[in-house]
Amino acid sequence: VLSDARTGSETIFDYPESCPVCHAAATRPEGEAVRRCNGGLNCAAQLFEGLKHFVARDAFDIEGLGARQIEQFIDLGWVQTPADIFRIGDKSAAMAELDGYGDLSIKKLLSAIAVRREISLERFIYALGIRQVGHATARLLALHYGSAEAMLAALSPDSDLDAAYQVLVEIDQIGTAVANDITAFFGNPNLYRLIVDLITE
């Protein structure tokens, strides 16, 4: 704090109690400095950023599907979950009526989506956008679980998540905070269902 820079006109900053976008409660996790929206994918801002991360070059890497297209498809109600991206072909006729979408561009987009139906487990885990899970941690989880099905079975909301947490912290380079975020993510029934839906696509 630079006390000498104070003028006397400073005011106390009140942290928001709710998200300015979706109005869900904004809470500050213990030990952190920032408040976070609890709205999840029900929050338009989180949905947009989450899907943008999902299709990014170092995640699913879907060519031709960037921030502009994601925002447009969300606004149209076509994409509300990651799995919806792989169902966007159902909207090809409606897409053809939009500005900037000719037959060739639609075919290229659908082809780019189709070839990414199978990716490495490491990329898949990273694409989920789990807090504190970057490429290195995603690689560790992929090596440990071996398959998406095994990972989902071990981290199901119906499983013993305390035991799953203990297994995670025993993995070299995964600490308690990261293990907490991983079990909290998969332990959320709504998020878990979205992942199961995604895998079926």
Regions found by a protein language model. Give the residues of each.
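Accessory alpha-helical DNA-binding modules that contact the DNA backbone or grooves
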Residues: 2-201
